[in-house]
């Protein structure tokens, strides 16, 4: 999701999501999420990933790695018959074991020829709860993970969300579909460019 006359969102360091591109110069140690949307034959694809500028702290690297792994762990369990609570549980349990926190204020979403539609895809939850997955469903999985507490606030621009404690935040996002027996990732990159860091 983008804003105003911008074509993407850029969420830097403690910005959780919906960061507005600016003329701020990136410096060594920055971590930035770039979130883009494509429209192909009237259908939407939504994806984001983390990039780092030069050397980053060990904590930032660990946060970025854990965020990516939590998304992929959730994706790998997708198939008809499981429930969205299973997806959230997979992310939450992995992240909290790493000592990080899962943002509750934002979630993934159904997506097709409408950008945001049901169901909401929470990145926390209990097993065997929520909507049951069926073939043909398409949605995003996009965990937002904080190095500190889960609390966020929206800035005065009414758009940019940041961590309340100013801790680092990271996010990855894929658009996925449920097939007859498994899943498909629609926003996957070429073979050599799947896993971070993309610096």
Give the predicted meaning of each segment.
Residues 1-199:
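Active-site neighborhoods and metal-handling regions in enzymes and metal-associated proteins
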């Amino acid at each position: 999701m983008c804003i105003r006359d911008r074509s993407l969102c850029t969420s830097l360091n403690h910005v959780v999501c919906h960061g507005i591109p600016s003329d701020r110069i990136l410096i060594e140690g920055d971590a930035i999420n770039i979130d883009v949307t494509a429209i192909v034959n009237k259908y939407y694809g939504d994806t984001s990933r983390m990039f780092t500028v030069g050397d980053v702290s060990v904590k930032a690297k660990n946060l970025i790695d854990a965020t990516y792994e939590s998304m992929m762990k959730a994706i790998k369990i997708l198939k008809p018959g499981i429930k969205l609570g299973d997806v959230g549980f997979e992310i939450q349990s992995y992240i909290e074991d790493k000592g990080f926190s899962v943002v509750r204020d934002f979630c993934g979403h159904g997506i097709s020829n409408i950008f945001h539609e049901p169901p909401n895809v929470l990145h926390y939850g209990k097993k065997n709860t929520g909507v049951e997955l069926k073939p043909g469903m398409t949605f995003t999985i996009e965990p937002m993970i904080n190095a500190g507490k889960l609390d966020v606030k929206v800035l005065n621009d009414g758009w940019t969300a940041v961590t309340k404690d100013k801790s680092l935040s990271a996010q990855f996002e894929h658009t996925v579909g449920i097939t007859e027996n498994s899943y498909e990732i629609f926003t996957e990159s070429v073979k050599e460019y799947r896993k971070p860091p993309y610096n």
